[in-house]
Amino acid sequence: MKKGPVLLAVLDGYGFSKDTKGNAILNAKTPFMDNLVKEYDHCYIEASGEYVGLPDGQIGNSEVGHLTIGAGRIVYTGLSLINQDIKTKKFDSNKTLLEAINHAKKNNSNIHIMGLLSPGGVHSNEQHIFEMIRIVSENGLKPVIHVFGDGRDVAPQSIISSLERLNDVLKKYPGTIATISGRFYSMDRDKRWERTKQAYDNLLGISNNYFDNPIDYVNKQYSENIFDEFLVPARINDSNVVIKDNDAVIHANFRPDRARQISHLFCGSTVYEEKNDHPLKNLYYAIMMTYEGITPTSILFPTVVVKNTFGEVVANSGLTQLRIAETEKYAHVTFFFDGGVEVDLKNESKILVDSKKVKTYDEVPAMSAVEITDKLIENLDKFDVIVLNFANADMVGHTGKYNEAVLAIEALDSQLARIDQKIKELNGTMFITADHGNAEVMLDDDNNPVTKHTTNPVIFISNNKDVKFNKPGSLGNVAPTILDFMGLEIPADMDKKSLLKK
């Protein structure tokens, strides 16, 4: 192995674009990264679409980005798997979906479909919801729909178009839109249980915020400067369509991290201790894919185990490793990076740094980068391999606040400089990449804020003069390259090659 620790820093949402308009990364003052790019060899690697197991042209995301980096190969996940089953009509006979339908029939109860109504393809795809509506209808039931607003992976004010498409589906396959809630409430992942419970209570009909027409309600929220992500949970005033005992519920989100908390309230888990004051009896609760630690009735698409990940190779080589991130991205350097499973590897340590308790991260663009760096420097000499995530470019990028995103990038740059200095003192090497783009495109052609991810490539660079890169590449090449640099054998399961120039 190369002397000194080897560190992989994943800069979440740090994409590359030559276009300076709305580019918080190029326009920020980043003396460390500027010098690194000037003095050290580097390449730009693909982080979206077919390169990370998504449909061609689909924006990358943190889940598949970290999964691909850690696996050293393309792993076909939620969106592609489900799309394929829909295309081949295999979805029509999905065992769990039919069991949920039969449960509702047997109990003379409702079947509910809830999830992010968005074409974004990051946490869900509205087409999957439309297909489930069709299948439920063709099996003789009228589904009840619970809409989660997006506004992050798509434009901040785009849900009306999705609702119009949903209404077109419901004209052919009758059902009811019963509730609406912004993902801020229904998809929290930071243990802000007051948000999750507000969404949950709305689904159960405990709240008293009503609407007559969902599109009218959204327009009213818009008039109050409340957009899709933050839509206040509301429902129609009809006790027959609330979620209650004996019902069947299908959570249509395939990405787990933002689906776990609300699922815990419905079906319990091994990861949360939060008490549910309104538990339901004889509920058939189905989830689209495995949400680690959640204990549903059944899963439509159980996770396929990824073997011989980067972390496993390091552990099996007898080396020590550290994973470190703040709350918002902790699951990405652990669960996703390890192939979509919760695992404690031999000689592995994990450090979770609390995310700041703010509504949105434009309020504190530095996020917890300083605290992460402090903890890292304190522990750097204790480990052979370190994987860390800095969330700034992604989480502040998602707010659509350009000036704050610039501040986020500048804060990030100063922490990378600190890490660079320390790792060089230890005769170690730092590799830097990103999981997808975001903060490099903060404005559209009409100067409207952009909050979503991009399809742009990301940088792959090292602070070691001896490291030279072959080109081109993708996120799948990162793990083989670092293993090659360390002198470790690249497992056959990693079908992507090292980019290390010999």
UniProtKB/Swiss-Prot annotation:
The lineage of its organism: Bacteria, Bacillati, Mycoplasmatota, Mycoplasmoidales, Mycoplasmoidaceae. Mn(2+) 2 binds at residues 12, 62, 435-436. NCBIfam families: pgm_bpd_ind (TIGR01307). Its EC number is 5.4.2.12. Gene3D superfamilies: Alkaline Phosphatase, subunit A, BPG-independent phosphoglycerate mutase, domain B. GO terms for cellular component: cytosol. Mn(2+) 1 binds at residues 394, 398, 453. Catalyzes the interconversion of 2-phosphoglycerate and 3-phosphoglycerate. Belongs to the BPG-independent phosphoglycerate mutase family. It comes from Malacoplasma penetrans (strain HF-2) (Mycoplasma penetrans). It is an enzyme of class 5 (isomerase). This is 2,3-bisphosphoglycerate-independent phosphoglycerate mutase. It catalyses: (2R)-2-phosphoglycerate = (2R)-3-phosphoglycerate. Substrate binds at residues 123, 152-153, 183, 189, 255-258, 329. Its cofactor is Mn(2+). Keywords: Glycolysis, Isomerase, Manganese, Metal-binding. GO terms for biological process: glucose catabolic process; glycolytic process. The active site is at 62 (phosphoserine intermediate). Binds 2 manganese ions per subunit. One of its GO terms (molecular function) is phosphoglycerate mutase activity. It holds the Pfam family Metalloenzyme.
